[in-house]
């Protein structure tokens, strides 16, 4: 069964058309009208090996918040949809990723219980302007939106970092690598749900 999803979401604030394939090779085509976010979502697809096509637009004349948030919401929903009942996946994974002085660790549990903890970001990171009109605060907001709408537990911890671009990119790549292994089929439990209660 193909682990794919295609979701279109239209609101008065944004328009999102997102398609993904969990069993891809990391091919991406990303256009969100927010250049730095394009860069981050491209990295997320590339390093998770999720094929990802996104066409998004919104009221970026106000700010990038709505377009960024709604894209993350739809990505989370598509991830949840493509995973189905989660039979045969590894479920748990973690990844630690460096980018120069920045070092981020992501820990994922594809549990069906949404939770997100982000920690370690330096004071003032949330106010940093990265690549124009993408603020540091949006990184945490993206992580929370993905976690809650994919119904996964995500812990994101920044171990070290100074440059806002490097911090954001290390965190996105850490999430990507953790997702790659958490959603990967485990040949030792083919067809089984990785939970003692029999459902996720």
From Swiss-Prot:
GO terms for molecular function: imidazoleglycerol-phosphate dehydratase activity. Its EC number is 4.2.1.19. It comes from the Bacteria. GO terms for biological process: L-histidine biosynthetic process. Keywords: Amino-acid biosynthesis, Cytoplasm, Histidine biosynthesis, Lyase. Pathway: Amino-acid biosynthesis; L-histidine biosynthesis; L-histidine from 5-phospho-alpha-D-ribose 1-diphosphate: step 6/9. It is found in: Cytoplasm. Belongs to the imidazoleglycerol-phosphate dehydratase family. PANTHER family: IMIDAZOLEGLYCEROL-PHOSPHATE DEHYDRATASE (PTHR23133:SF2), IMIDAZOLEGLYCEROL-PHOSPHATE DEHYDRATASE HIS7 (PTHR23133). HAMAP family: HisB. This is Imidazoleglycerol-phosphate dehydratase. The lineage of its organism: Bacteria, Bacillati, Actinomycetota, Actinomycetes, Bifidobacteriales.
């Amino acid at each position: 069964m193909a682990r794919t999803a295609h979701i279109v979401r239209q609101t008065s604030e944004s328009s999102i058309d997102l398609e993904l394939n969990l069993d891809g090779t990391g091919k991406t085509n990303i256009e969100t009208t927010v250049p730095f976010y394009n860069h981050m979502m491209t990295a997320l697809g590339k390093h998770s090996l999720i094929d990802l096509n996104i066409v998004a637009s919104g009221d970026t004349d106000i700010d990038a918040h709505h377009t960024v948030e709604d894209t993350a919401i739809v990505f989370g929903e598509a991830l949840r949809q493509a995973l189905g009942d989660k039979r045969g996946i590894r479920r748990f994974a973690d990844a630690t990723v460096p980018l120069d002085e920045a070092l981020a660790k992501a820990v994922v549990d594809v549990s069906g219980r949404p939770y997100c903890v982000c920690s370690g970001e330096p004071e003032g990171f949330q106010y940093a302007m990265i690549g124009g009109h993408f603020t540091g605060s949006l990184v945490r907001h993206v992580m929370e939106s993905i976690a809650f709408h994919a119904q996964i537990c995500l812990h994101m911890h920044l171990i070290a970092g100074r440059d806002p671009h490097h911090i954001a990119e290390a965190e996105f790549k850490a999430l990507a690598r953790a997702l790659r292994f958490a959603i990967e089929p485990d040949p030792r439990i083919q067809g089984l749900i990785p939970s003692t209660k029999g459902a996720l």
